[in-house]
Curated annotation (Swiss-Prot):
EC number(s) per entry: 1.2.1.41
Cross-referenced InterPro entries: Ald_DH/histidinol_DH, Ald_DH_C, Ald_DH_N, Aldehyde_DH_dom, G-glutamylP_reductase_CS, Glu-5-SA_DH, GPR_dom
Pathway: Amino-acid biosynthesis; L-proline biosynthesis; L-glutamate 5-semialdehyde from L-glutamate: step 2/2
Single GO BP term: L-proline biosynthetic process
Matches recorded under Pfam families: Aldedh
Protein name: Gamma-glutamyl phosphate reductase
NCBIfam families given in the database record: PRK00197.1, proA
Disulfide-bond pairs as recorded: none
Biological role: Catalyzes the NADPH-dependent reduction of L-glutamate 5-phosphate into L-glutamate 5-semialdehyde and phosphate. The product spontaneously undergoes cyclization to form 1-pyrroline-5-carboxylate.
Length: 421
């Protein structure tokens, strides 16, 4: 790491810590004013955003980025519209900061409760998608946190243009510019510095490929909110309603292939497999899904079904590929999910209350569903509004991380001159 990068990141960290103290006492109205003003600045800066993004796209093509990466990098007019609306949606969300709950009188006469407060300074490390700059900045600002955003080098010009709009919004509301800072160096040493400053940064949220997240999880000296994989399952129970099962299993895989809450493995109880798998096989093939199965599922899914390897059961495809396995019991299904899954989202289709309760209790995932598609694992669908990501960890935030997940609780105590005897 060069001294200059370390000095630069230290300056950002110090400024963010100071800004976080201002944000902790900032009113909801003032935060909303900053978000609305940033939205207006984005709207006014469409041409500048397009020009900056064109620079990144040209550099990406010259550097050999594939079409999928270029698509994620592109700031189309529709995506700029989405960013503007995203800022306004966050402004409309309830502010969790300052909420006091569970107030109760203790035998001593004091009142004890919990107050929701910001985490402080949040570092965001992400790749490719410039819209993450807006998503992360808006959620951190509304939850009273200062943020340092380190986007991918391939999006540097786009991120800087977006940052200028955010700074205009902050200035309009009278908030410090350091409340939202975008790292303006492409030197990779900046990431190492950001994740190694516990005196300035309270939590890191990585958004990107598995390699990035594994590196940050391994090297960070501050807590990390993350998920590594989205290996999601649907289990069709012996007591499933067949129509519901087919509908859920179809949607969980084919509504979209790339998201982290898309089903990657379908488990089917042997008692219903002969009725469920043939029609599902037809549906999947019609939608271009490659099927990989165990011996029993291959017989029922028909010609063209490939043999599933051991590696398939623990693979996140993010593609039109599905692993299928026939199991003999609910116990076997739960054991498979807990062994091969990523603790993200898993669903059971069943009419048995007993089986549903067992599945909910024993599957060790951040979201567990009954008779619903895994695609519902989403902050908007859960009523959280926007989300900064999904956490599969068990401490602090778990599942979709919205505004409340970017805060913590502290105990507050009220007395009237009370002393402990």
């Amino acid at each position: 790491m060069t001294e200059s990068v370390l000095d630069y990141m230290t300056r950002l960290g110090h400024a963010a810590r100071e800004a976080s103290r201002v944000l902790a006492r900032t009113s909801t109205a003032q935060k909303n004013r900053a978000l609305e003003a940033a939205a207006a600045a984005l709207d006014d800066a469409r041409e500048a955003l397009a020009a900056a993004n064109a620079q990144d796209l040209a550099a990406g093509r010259a550097g050999g980025l594939d079409e999928a990466m270029l698509d994620r990098l592109a700031l189309t007019p529709a995506r700029i519209d989405e960013m503007i609306e995203g800022l306004r949606q966050v402004a409309r969300l309830p502010d969790p900061v300052g909420e006091i709950r569970d107030m109760r009188y203790m035998p001593s006469g004091i009142q004890v409760g919990k107050m929701r407060v910001p985490l402080g300074v949040i570092g965001i490390v992400y790749e490719s998608r410039p819209n993450v700059t807006i998503d992360a900045a808006s959620l951190c600002l509304k939850s009273g946190n200062a943020t340092i955003l380190r986007g991918g080098s391939e999006a540097i010009h786009s991120n800087q243009a977006i940052a200028r709009c955010i700074r205009l919004g902050l200035a309009e509301a009278g908030l410090p510019a350091a409340a939202v800072q975008v790292v303006e160096t492409t030197d990779r040493a900046a990431v190492g510095a950001l994740i190694g400053m516990p005196e300035f940064v309270d939590v890191i949220v990585p958004r990107g490929g598995k390699g990035l997240i594994e590196r940050i999880s391994r090297e960070a000296k501050v807590p990390v909110i993350k998920h590594l994989d989205g290996i999601c399952h649907v289990y069709i129970d012996s007591a499933a309603d067949l129509d519901k099962a087919i509908r859920v299993a179809d949607n969980a895989k084919t509504q979209r292939f790339a998201p982290c809450n898309t089903m990657e493995t379908l488990l089917v109880h042997a008692a219903i497999a002969a009725r469920a798998l043939p029609p599902l096989g037809e549906i999947y093939r019609a939608k271009g899904v490659e099927l990989r199965g165990c011996p029993r599922s291959r017989e029922l899914l028909g010609p063209g079904t490939l043999e599933a390897s051991e590696e398939d059961w623990s693979s996140e495809y993010n593609a039109p590929i599905l692993s299928v396995r026939v199991v003999d019991s609910l116990d076997e299904a739960i054991a498979h999910i807990n062994r091969y899954g990523s603790h993200h989202t898993d669903a059971i289709v069943t009419e048995s209350f007993t089986d549903a309760r067992r599945f909910l209790a024993e599957v060790d995932s951040s979201s567990v569903m009954v008779n619903a598609s895994t695609r519902f694992a989403d902050g908007f669908e859960y009523g959280l509004g926007a989300e900064i990501g999904i956490s599969t960890d068990k401490l602090h935030a778990r599942g979709p991380v919205g505004l409340e997940g970017l805060t913590s609780e502290k105990y507050v105590v009220f007395g009237d001159g009370h002393v402990r005897g």
